[in-house]
Swiss-Prot record:
<protein>
    <recommendedName>
        <fullName>Cysteine desulfurase IscS</fullName>
        <ecNumber>2.8.1.7</ecNumber>
    </recommendedName>
</protein>
<comment type="function">
    <text>Master enzyme that delivers sulfur to a number of partners involved in Fe-S cluster assembly, tRNA modification or cofactor biosynthesis. Catalyzes the removal of elemental sulfur atoms from cysteine to produce alanine. Functions as a sulfur delivery protein for Fe-S cluster synthesis onto IscU, an Fe-S scaffold assembly protein, as well as other S acceptor proteins.</text>
</comment>
<dbReference type="InterPro" id="IPR015422">
    <property type="entry name" value="PyrdxlP-dep_Trfase_small"/>
</dbReference>
<comment type="pathway">
    <text>Cofactor biosynthesis; iron-sulfur cluster biosynthesis.</text>
</comment>
<dbReference type="InterPro" id="IPR015424">
    <property type="entry name" value="PyrdxlP-dep_Trfase"/>
</dbReference>
<comment type="subunit">
    <text>Homodimer. Forms a heterotetramer with IscU, interacts with other sulfur acceptors.</text>
</comment>
<dbReference type="GO" id="GO:0044571">
    <property type="term" value="P:[2Fe-2S] cluster assembly"/>
</dbReference>
<dbReference type="GO" id="GO:1990221">
    <property type="term" value="C:L-cysteine desulfurase complex"/>
</dbReference>
<comment type="similarity">
    <text>Belongs to the class-V pyridoxal-phosphate-dependent aminotransferase family. NifS/IscS subfamily.</text>
</comment>
<keyword id="KW-0808">Transferase</keyword>
<keyword id="KW-0479">Metal-binding</keyword>
<feature type="modified residue" description="N6-(pyridoxal phosphate)lysine">
    <location>
        <position position="206"/>
    </location>
</feature>
<keyword id="KW-0663">Pyridoxal phosphate</keyword>
<keyword id="KW-0963">Cytoplasm</keyword>
<feature type="binding site">
    <location>
        <begin position="203"/>
        <end position="205"/>
    </location>
    <ligand>
        <name>pyridoxal 5'-phosphate</name>
    </ligand>
</feature>
<dbReference type="InterPro" id="IPR010240">
    <property type="entry name" value="Cys_deSase_IscS"/>
</dbReference>
<dbReference type="Pfam" id="PF00266">
    <property type="entry name" value="Aminotran_5"/>
</dbReference>
Length: 404
């Protein structure tokens, strides 16, 4: 077993060796290096063929038409393109957007930008279980609502929203529905033929593909129009200009092909690993699971250890690669905005750790990690005067702290 142990699969995944092999074939002079937009010679034709094959592979994972897949640089760009693209195209129809307080920053900050441009955004509060229900969405809908954007799987707590039910609601009201599915490909079944979803964002690097490549699903029937945000040669039917990165696109295609093939057995294996891990740390007192345990992907366990500071716990767990909050915001020392939205107090939000498991996690690693967590939490609590007070029966919420 090699240390440190990687338990941060929701931040990024390593590239699957099969994906790396396919990518390496699209780089060198004797490989498939051409520009897919070169129409006049075989190098371009071969590259275009590889790109279109990958487009099919991405479409097949989510049961879409390949013509509905637009290549982007990742889920952040896909979120921007979907939300700004719809807002700008349909602004004559209305200027109201609905999203939730626990979306990824790529959605929240895009909405903030649109607010500066004169759009109005409603931010929904999730329930304590971290779920956004159709009832919450319905209560926020207005006559001038043009777009609802709700994520499929939350990146911090792994909860799975009922996008099928939300889609039925938005379609019946004539409102477009965007879903950020960066964390759900290869973990949750997605059938865009059945789902009433109009736009969906994908990322390769959360699904054992390379970083720097993603895609946006844009529905053809009923047709969804978006305004391109990147201007240039008119690639991707005018929705996203820029020379296509064949090697990355091929990597994403292969990663999604593998995901489709191996999802069922991998989910079962990862669920067994998570249950095994949780069973070994469950004996700790004052341990709280963040988010629903029933509507949740098997890869995620987000736990708060009361009376332990999350950052100090991460430092104590130097052999484990884990995180507090999402990779995109964990550099700030503010408590997780996702956990605050669930109603967790600052102390519990600060004491949370996200463990995320994946394709290369082993039982041996799980057992070692669980043992280290129990040791570190117990040791840090021994050092904590707050823990002593709690054990003596002091109600810490009633204590008045004073500066000296």
């Amino acid at each position: 077993m090699k240390l440190p142990i990687y338990l941060d699969y929701s931040a990024t995944t390593p590239v699957d060796p099969r994906v790396a092999q396919k990518m390496s074939e699209c780089l060198l002079m004797d490989g498939n290096f051409g520009n897919p937009a070169s129409r006049s010679h075989v190098f371009g034709w071969k590259a275009e063929e590889a790109v279109e094959n990958a487009r099919r592979q991405v479409a097949e994972l989510v049961n879409a038409d390949p013509r509905e897949i637009v290549w982007t640089s990742g889920a952040t760009e896909s979120d921007n393109l979907a939300i700004k693209g719809v807002a700008h195209f349909y602004s004559g129809k209305g200027k109201h957007i609905i999203t939730s307080k626990i979306e990824h920053k790529a959605v929240l900050d895009t909405c903030r930008q649109l607010e500066r441009e004169g759009f109005e955004v409603t931010y929904l509060e999730p329930g304590e279980d971290g779920l956004i229900t159709p009832a919450l969405v319905e209560a926020a809908l207005r006559d001038d609502t043009i777009l609802v954007s709700v994520m499929h799987v939350n990146n911090e707590i792994g909860t799975v929203n009922d996008i099928a039910a939300i889609g039925e609601l938005t379609r019946s009201r004539g409102v477009l529905f965007h879903v950020d599915a960066a964390q759900s490909t290869g973990k949750v079944e997605i059938d865009l033929d059945k789902l009433k979803v109009d736009l969906m964002s994908f990322s390769a690097h959360k699904t054992y593909g390379p970083k720097g490549i993603g895609a946006l699903y844009v529905r053809r029937k009923p047709r969804v129009r978006i305004e391109g945000q990147m201007h240039g040669g008119g690639h991707e039917r005018g929705m996203r200009s820029g020379t296509l990165a064949t090697h990355q696109i091929v990597g994403m295609g292969e990663a999604f092909r593998i995901a489709k093939e191996e999802m069922a057995q991998e989910n079962a294996r990862v669920l067994a690993l998570r249950d095994r891990f949780f069973a070994q740390i469950d004996g700790l007192e004052e341990l709280y699971i963040n988010g629903s345990m029933t509507s949740r992907v098997p890869h995620n366990l987000n736990v708060s250890f009361n009376y332990v500071e999350g950052e100090s716990l991460i430092m104590a767990l130097k052999d484990l690669a884990v995180s507090s909050g999402s990779a995109c915001t964990s550099a700030s020392l503010e408590p997780s905005y996702v956990l605050r939205a669930l109603g967790r107090n600052d102390e519990l939000a600060h004491s949370s750790i996200r463990f995320t498991f994946g394709r290369f996690t082993t039982e041996e690693e799980i057992d070692y990690a669980a043992k280290k967590v129990v040791e570190a939490v117990s040791k840090l609590r021994e050092l904590s005067p707050l823990w002593d007070m709690y054990k003596e029966g002091v109600d810490l919420s009633q204590v008045e702290w004073q500066a000296h």
